[in-house]
């Protein structure tokens, strides 16, 4: 069935197809039409960050930026759904076109630029939660916010989403917000990580709820840079690291007509880079912090490879676009078979 839907969707502009598919999915969920078409979710409970995940396969941030569709997406068998990236204020993102399919390479290039309706909208949407799995909320800074004031944006988002989230993901690795990736290094990183942890402690005290925090990192770092980020996360007692975001490299797509497009590349072309980062993190941290593996998971075997490299959980995005809901159960079954 998805093969037919994909043929239709891939005949449309990528962003139009994205919006149409989510609108249809949301309508089907509201009318209670999804269940007959969805396989029984794979049950393979795993505890990570102090949370019990129904299975190890989650939906990565970026698909449901405003939490308008997470209840429907949650019915497709995911053990977790991560919504966002959301910023304090609404922003339109970058000019269109800003989303490109690399069909032969099973990749996607996006330069969306954190287009979202703002954190107030997201919190109102999450208040209508019916999804029973783990809900992550991915937060970022507004484009207009200077790097030196980035912490303030993350704090504003944390204040807003803290009581609604099962975990919070800190996005400092999108290539589509100018200067954002600079937050991954040196004093910028130390200042941000310490400030976010202070805010977490204050919110924990105020609410009585402990919400774990994961940090999402880029694949375009040297091994030494990866280890430096890992050391900073461990020393500041973060609960998890998400590896990885999209890549700015085009080494894996030398013949694509879209290779010159600016933006982050995801899907199969980033798989090897992502797995390498996971392996470096796992070998360096020696179990000090769980790793959530994301990047180029197109088959169950790809999910298994991420787990074998050192990830405790995995997330899908581009693979879900190319393969549809069948990939969720395929990946979850492959990971469950490792137990």
Swiss-Prot record:
Localization in the cell: Cell membrane
Role noted for this protein: Catalyzes the conversion of dihydroorotate to orotate with quinone as electron acceptor.
Database matches in HAMAP family: DHO_dh_type2 (MF_00225)
Topology relative to the membrane: Peripheral membrane protein
Residues binding FMN: 61-65, 85, 138, 171, 216, 244, 267, 296, 317-318
SUPFAM superfamilies named among the record's database cross-references: FMN-linked oxidoreductases
Superkingdom, taxonomy of origin: Bacteria
Subunit description: Monomer.
Cofactors that this protein relies on: FMN
Cofactor binding note from Swiss-Prot or TrEMBL: Binds 1 FMN per subunit.
Presence of the UniProt keyword Membrane in the record: yes
InterPro entries attached to this UniProt entry: Aldolase_TIM, DHO_dehydrogenase, Dihydroorotate_DH_1_2, Dihydroorotate_DH_2, Dihydroorotate_DH_cat, Dihydroorotate_DH_CS
One Pfam family in the UniProt entry: DHO_dh
Protein name: Dihydroorotate dehydrogenase (quinone)
Residues annotated to bind substrate: 65, 110-114, 171, 176, 245-246
Catalytic reactions of this protein: (S)-dihydroorotate + a quinone = orotate + a quinol
PROSITE patterns per record: DHODEHASE_1 (PS00911), DHODEHASE_2 (PS00912)
Organism classification: Bacteria, Pseudomonadati, Pseudomonadota, Gammaproteobacteria, Cellvibrionales
Record keywords, A-Z: Cell membrane, Flavoprotein, FMN, Membrane, Oxidoreductase, Pyrimidine biosynthesis
Protein's UniProt keywords contain Membrane: yes
GO BP terms: 'de novo' pyrimidine nucleobase biosynthetic process; 'de novo' UMP biosynthetic process
UniProt source species: Teredinibacter turnerae (strain ATCC 39867 / T7901)
């Amino acid at each position: 069935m998805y093969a037919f839907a994909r043929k239709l969707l891939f005949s449309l502009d990528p962003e139009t197809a994205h919006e149409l598919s989510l609108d249809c999915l949301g309508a089907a969920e509201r009318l209670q039409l999804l269940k007959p078409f969805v396989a029984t979710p794979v049950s393979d409970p795993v505890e990570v960050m102090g949370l019990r995940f129904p299975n190890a396969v989650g939906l990565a941030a970026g698909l449901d930026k405003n939490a308008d569709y997470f209840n429907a997406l949650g019915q497709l068998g995911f053990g977790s759904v991560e919504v966002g990236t959301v910023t304090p204020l609404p922003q339109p993102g970058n000019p269109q076109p800003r989303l490109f399919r690399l069909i032969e390479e099973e990749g996607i290039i996006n330069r969306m630029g954190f287009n979202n309706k703002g954190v107030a909208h997201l919190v109102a949407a999450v208040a209508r939660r019916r999804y029973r799995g783990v809900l992550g909320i991915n937060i970022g800074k507004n484009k207009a916010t200077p790097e030196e004031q980035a912490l303030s944006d993350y704090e504003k988002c944390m204040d807003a989403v803290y009581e609604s989230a099962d975990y919070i993901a800190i996005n400092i690795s999108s290539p589509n917000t100018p200067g954002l990736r600079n937050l991954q290094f040196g004093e910028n990183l130390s200042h941000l990580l310490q400030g976010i942890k202070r805010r977490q402690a204050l919110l924990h005290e105020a609410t009585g709820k402990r919400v774990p925090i994961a940090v999402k990192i880029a694949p375009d770092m040297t091994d030494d840079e990866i280890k430096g980020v890992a050391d900073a996360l461990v020393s500041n007692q973060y609960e998890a690291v998400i590896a990885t975001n999209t890549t700015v490299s085009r080494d894996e797509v030398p013949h694509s007509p879209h290779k010159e497009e600016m933006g982050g590349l995801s899907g199969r072309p980033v798989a090897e880079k992502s797995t390498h980062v996971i392996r470096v993190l796992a070998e360096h941290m020696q179990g000090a912090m769980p790793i959530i593996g994301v990047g180029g998971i197109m088959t169950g075997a790809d999910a298994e490879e991420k787990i074998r490299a050192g990830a405790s959980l995995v997330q899908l995005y581009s693979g879900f676009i190319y393969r549809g809901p069948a990939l969720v159960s395929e990946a979850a079954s492959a990971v469950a078979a490792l137990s």
